[in-house]
Amino acid sequence: RDLRMSRGLGDVYKRQMLLYDNTKQEAYMKPHIHTITELAIFTAIAFIFSYIESLFPLPIPFPGIKLGLANLVIVLVLYKNGFCQALTVSIVRGLLNAFTFGSLFGFLYSLAGSVLSLIIMNLLKNKTHLHISAFGVSVAGGITHNIGQFAVAAWLVGPSGILPYFPFLYFSGLIAGGLIGAFVLLCRQRIPLFSSTN
């Protein structure tokens, strides 16, 4: 009888531990699933913006200059989810672009610009004592994004052939970053999902 009782208590203990482990695992997985789902949605939106922008190129006689609507999503993710998540969205979006309507070289340009601009934007965003707004961060990101792309082009074809092109890239990054920054401020003021972020 004592042996049966001991086995019964052991079974109850095992069931309780199994239930505890399952509950603990669910509590651990829920925020991760939410984050993955959220980033997937942001990536899809950024990809759609890139695709729409590819259908309506700007009437400018300089190749590669565009507004970069997808960067609106990237900057918002940077403020809401942080650097790593913004970088993830940017890289996955770049890969989707390359596999659908882009090219390998286009992905290299995009990757260089995205990584450099995100590093700079993250540094400026975290320098809270400088009081740099999301608008200023976005402007810096627009400029450094084009600088990163220029660096890749200079490495591939040589700097002498594209050096005269640099001022146009600089000012286009300045203008695009300003426009994106204005939209970022508007989204953070009007959309509750982003309004509580730093």
For the regions a language model picked out, list residue spans one by one.
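Hydrophobic transmembrane alpha-helices
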Residues: 29-77
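Short helix-perturbing small/polar motifs within transmembrane alpha-helices
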Residues: 39-41, 48, 89, 110-144
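Short, small-residue-biased leader/transition segments that mark boundaries at the very start
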Residues: 1-13
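Interfacial aromatic-anchored transmembrane helix boundaries in multi-pass membrane proteins
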Residues: 50-67, 92-121, 157-161, 165-166
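Generic transmembrane alpha-helix motif of multi-pass integral membrane proteins
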Residues: 69-83, 120-125
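Membrane-embedded alpha-helical hairpins and interfacial helices in multi-pass inner-membrane proteins
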Residues: 103, 107-108, 127-198
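Alpha-helical transmembrane segments of multipass membrane proteins
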Residues: 46-50, 93, 97, 117, ...
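Residue-level signature of transmembrane alpha-helical entry/exit and packing/kink sites
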Residues: 31-42, 67, 71, 86, ...
